[in-house]
Each structure stands twice: as structure tokens, then as C-alpha cells.
């Protein structure tokens, strides 16, 4: 018999193919040394791919997820949240801003540097802790995750990056649907996600969401009340001006969590137990039907809301739906020019890419003067990881990367029904792949993605 430890998963195959695609991109590069080191970009050249590939293999084969990992990670992440909050309120404990020009300080935060990189970290960790709280097996863990989520959402305002709202919002919706779906499964007396949890995951979602909104509300009052950090806020961070709405939502979520928790306290529905004789088949069917209606109603409302938002925004020419060169802080300009560059590449480069971290070379060679005139800067990244891989590693690189992501999602979905420890990794991964549509790959938070993928592969292999 073949040991499960040595079972080859689809995600393993795609990881190897992704590394091979990176090697061919390295061969296709005009400056191979720059392609290897990534020195003309964000230091994510072929050497970086080799490192994350080696880490993936080691972790996927030899490591496993322990229950203590998430609480420790929560404490460490909480410190980075706290530092960003203090810096936002102009309290620089370690004088990290001393060597940064005053007009550039708003672009740097916490221990991560650029605000978009810190936002990427928030997109990884906040959904992770949300899921960890939903499926926590002890009350003290749920309290810890809720407190960390409270500070994490305060840090979202400090980050002042719209990326965070996108990367956190989508996993939150996914976790909401997972929590509701869990209730349907529970009343059907089937195996449920988080069957080892101390509490109902849907209740965990309510508590976590209450902590998040409450943290955002408190930070909004601190920012507007003291005036510190307010002037630099842009985009969605201007939600701090709507303090009354935030307060009402916070109160509703807190009261709703208390009422729901009190109502389900004696039911212990989160644990799959033998059928209770006192509960008739009719009652079970009725309850299951109610939760199914709630589930599909939420799905319908989300789809309808998205449709109405897009139609209304397009008709009223909202900035986010007006794609021009200035869209997304000039992301529209970069994407448009990179698509033109890709279309004009030789066939071999379309397949295998123009070389790892070659965006700076390509943009400078063709649009140097225009880029400076329009945007005022020189771009070395596509600010979209998928477009970045398409141009630098070709269609082969993009397909293998997407295959790695999709196969890892499949690993997580199959595993999460048996082991709730996988759900936080899956939620964090979703947060990252969503924010990657408008953010950059870099050697600070991108390795977390490959770590999560490797951990899920290892858990899947051992299951």
C-alpha cells in the first residue's frame, strides 16, 4: 500500500508545473540575472519561486497544523495591528517614521512598510481569525479571536487602503454562507463543518462580525474625535464619517449575537449527536427547511445587490465603474498598457513570458516618458498578480498558477468537512487571491499564500 504521506495531489502537480513555468520564463528573459534575483521588481524573481517551491514541498510533506498555531499567530498579528493603530494616532513608539520623509509617511505603516502590503496581510489574517473563531473548540479561543478581530478592523482604517475592504469582504460573505449551510446540515443530522466546535459556527460568525464592526466604529470615533490620521484617509476609509450608521450596526450585531446565543445555548446544535427522541422528524424537516430558505435568500440578496450596484454604478458613472487611466490610482493605466505590450510580444513570450519581474523593463522601454507624465512615477509591477504572471511568465505561468489555486481550494473544501482546522487556512487563502486582483506580489506576504496552500495539501494528504 502507498503511504498517504507520499500521495501526490493535484495541487502538488500544479506547484511543480508552476516552478517549471518560472524556469522557462527565466530562460526567456533578456536579462537573466535580473530575472533570477527580481532586482528590477519586487524581488520575486526565479530565486523567490525556488524558495517558495522548496518551502511548499517541505511543509506539504513534513508538517501538520496544530491547534495552538492559530492562537499564537493571533497574538503575533495582534501586535502588528496595535502598532499600526498607534502610528495612525501619531504615536510612534519605536521612532520608525524618523528616517522617512514627512510627505511619504502616509504610505508606510506598522512593521510591513507600504500600506498596500500591510493591507495584504490584513486580507490574509482577518478572515483566518474569523474562521478560527467560528470553529473554535474552547470559549477562551473565541474570546481571543474576537479581541484580535476588534483590533484588526481598527487597523483597517490605519492601513488606509481600499484593497483591505475587498480582500476581507469576500471571505466574510463566504464564511457567512458556510455558517448558514452548517445549520442546514446540522438539522439534517449529517456530518457538519466544525462538528468539534464548542459553539455553532453561525453564532461564531455573528460574534466575529460584531467584533469587527465594533472595532471599526471605535477607530472611527478616535480618528474623527482626535483629528489624528484623519487628513490622510482616502477612498473607502472615509466611512469613518458615517459614525451614526456604524454605531447602529454595531449595536444590532452585538444584541443579535447575544439573543441568538441565548436562544441556542441549550440546543448544542453544533455537535452532531444521535437523533434525539424528543425531536420529531417533522420538526427537523421544518427547521432544516427554514435554514435552507435563509441560505438561498442570502445568496439571492447578494446576487441582486451585486447586480443593482453594478447597473447603478455604470449608469451613474461612479468612479469605481469608470475604467480609464486614472482608475484605481492609475491601475487602469498600467493594466491597459501591459495588455498592449502582451499583445505585441512574440509567440514564444506569449506562451512562456517576457521574464520574471520584467514589468519595469517592458514599461520603461515603451512608455517611459508617457508613464512619468501621466502617473508621475515608474511602475515595476502590474498591481494585479494575475496580469503580472501573464506578462512575465506567459499563459503557461498563469494557467499553472490558477490550477494551483483552484486545486488547493478543492483540497480545502473536501477537507473542511472533516477537520475544521482547515477552514481558517481556506478563508485566509480566499482573502489573498481576491486582493491579488488589485495588489502586488512581494516577498513579505506572498509567502503566506504558499504556506497556506502547503499546509492544506499536507492536511489533505493525511486525511
What do these predicted regions represent?
Residues 1-50, 54-75, 132-146, 168-295, ...:
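Transmembrane signal-anchor hairpin modules in multi-pass inner-membrane enzymes, especially those
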Residues 26-37, 79-120, 150-157, 165-166, ...:
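Membrane-interfacial helix-loop-helix modules of multi-pass inner-membrane proteins that assemble, modify
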Residues 42-43, 83-98, 308-358:
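Aromatic-rich transmembrane-lumenal/periplasmic boundary elements in polytopic membrane proteins
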Residues 77, 144-150, 193-197, 380, ...:
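Loop-to-helix entry and N-terminal half of a specific, functionally important transmembrane alpha helix
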Residues 114, 330-379, 393-399:
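TM-adjacent membrane-interface loops and short helices in multi-pass inner/ER membrane proteins
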Residues 121, 163-175, 398-403, 449:
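Transmembrane-embedded, aromatic-rich helix segments that form part
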Residues 142, 393-424:
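Hydrophobic transmembrane alpha-helices and their immediate junctions
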Residues 388-393, 423-453:
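Membrane helix-loop boundary segments at the extracytoplasmic
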Amino acid at each position: 500500500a502507498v503511504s498517504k504521506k507520499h500521495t501526490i495531489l493535484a495541487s502538488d502537480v500544479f506547484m511543480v508545473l508552476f516552478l517549471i513555468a518560472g524556469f522557462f520564463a527565466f530562460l526567456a528573459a533578456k536579462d537573466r540575472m535580473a530575472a533570477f534575483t527580481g532586482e528590477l521588481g519586487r524581488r520575486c524573481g526565479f530565486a523567490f519561486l525556488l524558495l517558495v517551491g522548496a518551502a511548499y514541498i517541505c511543509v506539504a510533506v513534513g508538517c501538520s497544523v496544530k491547534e495552538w498555531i492559530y492562537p499564537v499567530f493571533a497574538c503575533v498579528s495582534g501586535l502588528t495591528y496595535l502598532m499600526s493603530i498607534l502610528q495612525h494616532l501619531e504615536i510612534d513608539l519605536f521612532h520608525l517614521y524618523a528616517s522617512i520623509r514627512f510627505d511619504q509617511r502616509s504610505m508606510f505603516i506598522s512593521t510591513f512598510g507600504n500600506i498596500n502590503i500591510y493591507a495584504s496581510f490584513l486580507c490574509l489574517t482577518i478572515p483566518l481569525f474569523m474562521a478560527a473563531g467560528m470553529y473554535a473548540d474552547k470559549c477562551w479561543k473565541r474570546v481571543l479571536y474576537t479581541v484580535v478581530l476588534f483590533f484588526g478592523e481598527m487597523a483597517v482604517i490605519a492601513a488606509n487602503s481600499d484593497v483591505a475592504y475587498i480582500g476581507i469582504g469576500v471571505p466574510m460573505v463566504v464564511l457567512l454562507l458556510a455558517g448558514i449551510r452548517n445549520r442546514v446540515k446540522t438539522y439534517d443530522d449529517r456530518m457538519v463543518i466544525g462538528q468539534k466546535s464548542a459553539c455553532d459556527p453561525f453564532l461564531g460568525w455573528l460574534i466575529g462580525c460584531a467584533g469587527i464592526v465594533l472595532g471599526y466604529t471605535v477607530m472611527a470615533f478616535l480618528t474623527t474625535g482626535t483629528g489624528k490620521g484623519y487628513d490622510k484617509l482616502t477612498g473607502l476609509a472615509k466611512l469613518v464619517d458615517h459614525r451614526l450608521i456604524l454605531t447602529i450596526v454595531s449595536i444590532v450585531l452585538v444584541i443579535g449575537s447575544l439573543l441568538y446565543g441565548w436562544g441556542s445555548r441549550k440546543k448544542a446544535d453544533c455537535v452532531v449527536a444521535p437523533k434525539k427522541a424528543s425531536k420529531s422528524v417533522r420538526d427537523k424537516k421544518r427547521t432544516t427547511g427554514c435554514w435552507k430558505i435563509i441560505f438561498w435568500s442570502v445568496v439571492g440578496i447578494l446576487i441582486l445587490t451585486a447586480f443593482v450596484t453594478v447597473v447603478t454604478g455604470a449608469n451613474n458613472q461612479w468612479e469605481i465603474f469608470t475604467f480609464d487611466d486614472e482608475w484605481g490610482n492609475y491601475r487602469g493605466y498600467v493594466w491597459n498598457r501591459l495588455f498592449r505590450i502582451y499583445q505585441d510580444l512574440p509567440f514564444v513570450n506569449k506562451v512562456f513570458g517576457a521574464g520574471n519581474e520584467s514589468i519595469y523593463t517592458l514599461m520603461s522601454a515603451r512608455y517611459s516618458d508617457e508613464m512619468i507624465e501621466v502617473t508621475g512615477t515608474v511602475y515595476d509591477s502590474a498591481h494585479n498578480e494575475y496580469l503580472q504572471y501573464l506578462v512575465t511568465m506567459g499563459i503557461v505561468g498563469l494557467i499553472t498558477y490558477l490550477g494551483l489555486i483552484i486545486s488547493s481550494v478543492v483540497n480545502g473544501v473536501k477537507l473542511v468537512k472533516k477537520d475544521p482546522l482547515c477552514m481558517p487556512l481556506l478563508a485566509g487563502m480566499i482573502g489573498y487571491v481576491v486582493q491579488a486582483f488589485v495588489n502586488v506580489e512581494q516577498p513579505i506576504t506572498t509567502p503566506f499564500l504558499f504556506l497556506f496552500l502547503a499546509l492544506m495539501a499536507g492536511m489533505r494528504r493525511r486525511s
